[in-house]
Amino acid sequence: MNWVPSMRKLSDELLIESYFKATEMNLNRDFIELIENEIKRRSLGHIISVSS
């Protein structure tokens, strides 16, 4: 998928904001998991309590 690497261009703040907005809007679970994976990759899971 071409757009997944684009998540790396998002700031940490925008990535976290996107996660909360996506969950609030009940967006597609696969999309939310992509965001969660990027959050974990950046070691930011503690901010949103993403389980490993």
Swiss-Prot record:
Q: What effect is documented for mutating residue 34 to A?
A: Partial loss of ability to inhibit KinA autophosphorylation
Q: Which residues form the signal peptide?
A: none
Q: Please, one GO biological process term?
A: sporulation resulting in formation of a cellular spore
**What outcome is documented for mutating residue 31 to H in this protein?**
Complete loss of ability to inhibit KinA autophosphorylation
Q: Which positions does the site annotation Important for interaction with KinA cover?
A: 25, 27, 31
Known function: Mediates a developmental checkpoint inhibiting initiation of sporulation (by preventing phosphorylation of spo0A) in response to defects in the replication initiation machinery. Inhibits autophosphorylation of the histidine protein kinase KinA, forming a molecular barricade that prevents productive interaction between the ATP-binding site in the catalytic domain and the phosphorylatable His in the phosphotransfer domain of KinA. Probably also inhibits the activity of KinB, but has relatively little effect on KinC.
From the Swiss-Prot or TrEMBL record, what is one GO molecular function term? protein kinase inhibitor activity
Tell me the keywords, alphabetical order. Protein kinase inhibitor, Sporulation
Subunit field text:
Forms a stable heterotetramer with KinA (comprising two molecules of each protein), by binding to the KinA dimerization/phosphotransfer domain.
- What organism is the protein native to? Bacillus subtilis (strain 168)
Q: What is this protein called?
A: Sporulation inhibitor sda
Disulfide bond positions:
none
